[in-house]
Structures are given as structure tokens and as C-alpha cells.
Design a protein with these regions (language model features):
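N-terminal Rossmann-fold NAD(P) dinucleotide-binding loop
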Residues: 44-45
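Conserved beta-strand elements of the Class I
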Residues: 35-36, 197
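NAD(P)-binding Rossmann-fold cofactor-contacting core
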Residues: 53-78
Length: 230
């Protein structure tokens, strides 16, 4: 029997952004100034807060296809973040000089191109999780040190990697390793302030379970929630 029932979408949103934050902690440069978030949905919100847990930014630029949604997003969160939130008219201006970039859109075709990315940037690629879809162009994958959350999922679902592989631009050896291997010291992370690093997020079920159990334990310890009979 289950020990708890909770909203899985909220758990997934938080743990996804938390995983990106861990990757950012280990792969991004220590000294950063600008954060760029592409998207205005639930993951954009979660990443806005999670990124600020691991790095201090002087400016955060937000882009989305719908300008009204971008402004609504900024108005909703600007008083909760001690950093200037800026509306970006297009993707190019959003990522200009950005030190950390989070792509959290539903785009099936590339919206982000390598020519716009500064040297030393770190990217969290989150939005696309289907083999034939990608938010970024192949050059970004080729020019970056490419890290993943789970290798098996990457080889089946990471669109930007699989598209580049299908076009014979790279092979599996281009994957630097799983972020867990970097954390454990089994793989090297960033080795210079000029290289571009990418973290591909596809999600791992065990992360959801761990996050849900943490919420359950806290709810139980603080007498929060409702006891029901099944």
C-alpha cells in the first residue's frame, strides 16, 4: 500500500530544477553575472529560484514566445528575487553575455544557436526530451563538454545529441559522463573558464521518489497533511 499521495507534477518540477542547480554548482564558473531563462512555464519558475541557490547573479533575463506571459512572469517573481529581472525581446538578446542559460521551452526546433553563446557559459538543457526534437543547434553540442543525468536515457531520448549523432557529427564518446560521476570525482567537470559546458536533463524516476519521500517525512514530522483510509 502507498504511504502517501501527493501532486507528482509539483515534485517533478522542483526536483528537476534542483538537479539543474547541482549541475550548475559543479559545472558553471564560480564568478557569474548574467542568468538567462528561456521559457515562462513551471520549469522556468523552478529554475529561477534554484539557480539563485547556487550562484549570485547581477541580472536575470527572461524570454518567451508570448511577451505578455514574460511580463506576467517578471511581475509575479520580481519581488521574491534580489536580482533585476529583465524582459528579453528575442533569444539572441536573452543569452547575450549570459554565464548560465536554462532552456525550459516546449520548442521542437532549435531556438538557441552556438554563435550567440559566450565562451565559458554553462547551459542546462531541460525542455526537450524526445529523440527527434531539440531546443538547440548541433554546434552547441559539438562545441561543448556535454554532461548528462543518466546515460541510458540520453542515448534514447536526448534530441540534440541524437540528431548530431544521426548526422555523423559525433559519437557516444562525446558524452563526458553523468553528473553523478562528476560529483563523485570519477569524471572531470569544468577545467577552464573558457570552455562551454552543457548539462542535459531528462529526469530520473529515483529523483522523484527521493524528493517525494523527503516531502513525506517532513509532512509527517510537522503534522501536515490529511490521513486517509485506503
Amino acid at each position: 500500500l502507498p504511504i502517501a499521495i501527493m501532486d507528482g507534477s509539483v515534485i517533478t518540477s522542483i526536483r528537476t530544477a534542483a538537479a539543474s542547480a547541482v549541475a550548475t554548482e559543479y559545472l558553471a564558473r564560480k564568478k557569474v553575472s548574467i542568468l538567462s531563462i528561456l521559457g515562462t512555464g513551471e520549469q522556468a519558475k523552478s529554475h529561477l529560484y534554484s539557480m539563485n541557490c547556487v550562484r549570485s547573479f547581477n541580472q536575470i533575463k527572461i524570454w518567451g514566445r508570448n511577451p505578455d506571459k514574460v511580463q506576467t512572469f517578471i511581475n509575479k517573481h520580481k519581488n521574491n528575487i534580489n536580482t533585476n529581472l529583465k524582459y528579453a525581446e528575442n533569444v539572441e538578446s536573452a543569452v547575450k553575455n549570459a554565464d548560465v542559460i536554462c532552456t525550459v521551452t516546449s520548442s521542437s526546433k532549435p531556438i538557441l544557436f552556438s554563435k550567440w553563446i559566450r565562451s565559458g557559459a554553462h547551459l542546462n538543457l531541460v525542455g526537450s526530451s524526445v529523440a527527434n526534437k531539440s531546443e538547440v543547434d548541433s554546434d552547441i553540442v559539438l562545441k561543448s563538454k556535454y554532461y548528462v543525468d543518466y546515460l541510458e536515457s540520453t542515448l534514447a531520448q536526448a534530441g540534440e545529441f541524437l540528431i548530431a549523432k544521426k548526422n555523423r557529427l559525433l559519437d557516444d564518446s562525446h558524452i563526458q559522463g553523468e553528473i553523478g560521476e562528476v560529483i563523485l570525482g570519477k569524471k572531470k567537470g569544468r577545467t577552464s573558464d573558457t570552455e562551454i559546458t552543457v548539462y542535459k536533463s531528462l529526469g530520473i524516476a529515483s529523483q522523484d521518489l527521493a524528493a517525494a519521500y523527503y516531502v513525506y517525512q517532513n509532512a509527517k514530522n510537522n503534522n501536515i497533511g490529511q490521513l486517509i483510509k485506503i
